[in-house]
Amino acid sequence: MTLTADTLLAGPRGRRLCLEVLRLAPDGPEARDAAWAVSWAAQALDENPGTVVAIAGDASSFTEPEVSPAEAAAALARVAIPELTDALLFTALSLAVDHAAYWQPPSGEDVLAATEDLQPVLERVAAAVAGAPGTSWWGSGVERDTQAMVRWENSPASMEAPEELSARWRSEQVEEEVSFARQIDDVRLSGSWWSTPAFALPRSTRVRGTAGPVGLTLVEDSWGWTSARVRPLAAPDGEVIEIDGPEAWAALCRRHPFPVTASRRNVWGRTTGREGMWMQPDWAAVAGEAAGVHLSVSGYLATAGRVVGLGDLGASTVAGWGPDETFWFSPVEQSAPEQEWVRDGDTWNRV
């Protein structure tokens, strides 16, 4: 899927990226006013807004400002789109990814970004982002020649064959569905929220210059890791299924449907507001027809966290993936010595 303004505005993560671009504008009166307006407008829309704490003074006299989405939109409209450097775009992308959470209601910022009031403001940002040189690779397929796998904090790599991992994934998913089905009426019950293949499968992202693999930074709800081992991979031969948008995801779910209503109904219901049947791909079946499956950046921005309709099969969503991530169903070979990387602030550096 080619990255377009419509692509960005179609999905929750794409809209959040556009909002983050404006929030990264250089400091100034307009940027400060917009930051203030967005903060309070989002606070009012958040189902879990938290508590305002007064550090000094009389807290009892404080009244939270009431800022409407229309007022926040007006403040954002006065902010000039910042220079869309590669660094700024990647920072906005990483922020949009890090704030993804599919086991709870959407954040106030995500709700705000989906309002009609903000659409004209985000449209101009989306058009600029889609036309920026730094996003030219966001719609591309898997880049086989520069793949690398990330292992956080020296976590061990799985020694099982990918075929065994996929087969066990299916049996564990069946057991999980049966278990949750016994408690189907408990609306408080949480559950698995991801829709990925088996986590222990080899998975990788492309390497971009000296910054290393994008998988070091583009991590949903990251745990604040400060060290990682990076293993360059030789991508296996064979077809790689491309998920470049909701249509591709829907086609995969229809071709290999796996029901997950019992385990996902509460978590995906909270994050999307939808009730009904849920499906995801049967990854064990998908593994029988391809060497891997790749989620492009534009596919992620348009699809992650979005309700993807499947007709009589219900609906699905992409959750738990990273942009540009490939899960490999075939064995992979290490192509170069493993590297140690450490994080200094927001920057990863090779040791």
Pin down the residues of each PLM region.
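N-terminal/edge-of-domain interface segments
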Residues: 178, 184-186, 191-215
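Aromatic- and glycine-enriched beta-alpha-beta binding-site module
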Residues: 208-238
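Active-site and NAD+-binding cores of ADP-ribose-processing enzymes
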Residues: 1-192, 227-351
